[in-house]
């Protein structure tokens, strides 16, 4: 069976010859216990939790972290100095009451995210090709910037299309640049493929929005290749689902 690029990344990072469910759980347990020790030492938000877990099964007895926890105590979840924070992502809550939800990232967090993105994108981004990125570009450590850096590490060329262009402008950019790969949301991709059926796109990864099966099927038919839907979250460093 073919080993995925993400599996290979984890093996290299953890110094493992191979990955099984057993050693994956051992790695997870070890990381959790090291984090719990840091929480105790630094009196972090989770400092009241046990200092050690004997098995992953014990996670079932621990409380969930809620959106309210992030809004009210997000700064207490940071286990490094303020100077070590490279990026803060803020998500406003719905309605007019309640504070914003903030997630903090260090330079090491962003580096891990780029490595994760590069491993995943290597399944469809090839050296020497171009990748059109229809994600927000908001400065150093932004989502678009992290994806672009991952594309460059694969020897490919990122096209920073962003999310503010009209479909007409995006289509013009497609014809001008001729990218082989697309990274962005599913509905804009499908709209572009319908508007310009003869574009250069042959592969795509979609994220940041739900991708219904009917949309996926039509995109795959128009691309002539498998579509890669990805679901991540701010709380897991953008990459982890």
Predicted regions and their residues:
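Nucleotide 5′-phosphate-binding alpha/beta core
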Residues: 1-92, 98-112, 119
């Amino acid at each position: 069976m073919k080993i995925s690029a993400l599996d290979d990344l984890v093996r290299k990072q953890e110094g493992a010859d191979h990955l099984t469910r057993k050693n994956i759980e051992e790695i997870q347990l070890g990381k959790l216990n090291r984090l719990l020790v840091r929480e105790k030492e630094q009196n972090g938000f989770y400092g009241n939790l046990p200092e050690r877990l004997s098995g992953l099964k014990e996670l079932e007895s621990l409380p969930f972290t809620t959106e309210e926890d992030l809004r009210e105590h997000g700064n207490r979840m940071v286990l490094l100095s303020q100077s070590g924070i490279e990026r803060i992502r803020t998500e406003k809550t719905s309605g007019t009451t309640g504070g914003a939800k903030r997630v903090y990232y260090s330079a090491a967090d962003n580096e891990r995210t780029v490595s994760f993105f590069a491993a995943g994108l290597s399944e469809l981004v090839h050296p020497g090709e171009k990748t059109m990125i229809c994600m927000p570009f908001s400065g150093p450590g932004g989502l678009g910037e992290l994806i672009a850096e991952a594309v460059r590490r694969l020897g490919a060329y990122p096209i920073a299309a962003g999310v503010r262009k009209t479909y007409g402008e995006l289509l013009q950019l497609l014809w001008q640049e001729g990218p082989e790969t697309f990274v962005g949301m599913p509905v804009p991709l499908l709209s572009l493929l319908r508007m310009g059926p003869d574009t250069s796109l042959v592969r795509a990864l979609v994220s940041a929005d739900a991708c219904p099966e009917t949309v996926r099927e039509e995109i795959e038919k128009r691309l002539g290749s498998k579509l890669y839907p990805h679901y991540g979250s701010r709380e897991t460093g953008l990459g982890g689902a």
